[in-house]
A protein has these predicted regions:
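Extended, low-hydrophobicity, polar/charged segments
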Residues: 1-159
Length: 159
């Protein structure tokens, strides 16, 4: 089970007990915000994209109230944003849809955090299942996710 691999991953930091598991689904930003008890923007939304070349994928983690801006994505990564197909998600990220996170990923996974997260002291990414999360400060999140860099590839969702 992917949540167990993420718990094991956090053991190296002494944080395995901080992984929260909920009775209800936290697979979407809205559901995760309800489960955690925070505003939707503080949910760290993980999106996975195909790489330009080769196997593996790009994971971009954003605040819960933004969406990828295609022109910013293309400018940053030199290619169009093409999200992983459902059948490729588990193989390329190590996690099933709804539980994709930037922890315990297979080789070839490049993680980037969007600057939209930096508005918050603490954010809540998933932990490998559709009913899990962990509270992390942004500097911890960057370190634990082994992110390559902070990027600016999003825009606010129009209400």
């Amino acid at each position: 089970m992917a949540i167990e691999s993420v718990r094991e991953y956090f053991r190296q930091y002494g944080r395995e007990q901080d992984v929260m598991e909920f009775d209800a689904s936290s697979a979407t930003v809205e559901l995760a915000a309800k489960a955690v008890g925070v505003e939707e923007a503080r949910i760290a939304k993980t999106m996975s994209f195909y790489k330009k070349e080769g196997d593996g994928c790009i994971i971009v983690v954003t605040a819960g109230d933004v969406k990828v801006d295609n022109s910013k994505f293309k400018h940053t990564f030199g290619m169009k944003a093409k999200m992983l197909k459902g059948e490729d998600v588990q193989r390329l990220t190590g996690h099933a849809p709804g539980g994709v996170c930037p922890f315990a990923n297979p080789e070839g996974t490049d993680v980037f955090l969007d600057v939209s997260l930096q508005r918050f002291e603490t954010v809540y990414p998933a932990c490998g299942s559709a009913n899990s999360a962990i509270a992390l400060k942004c500097d911890e999140f960057f370190r634990y996710s082994h992110a390559q860099s902070w990027v600016d590839v999003c825009k606010r969702i129009e209400e």
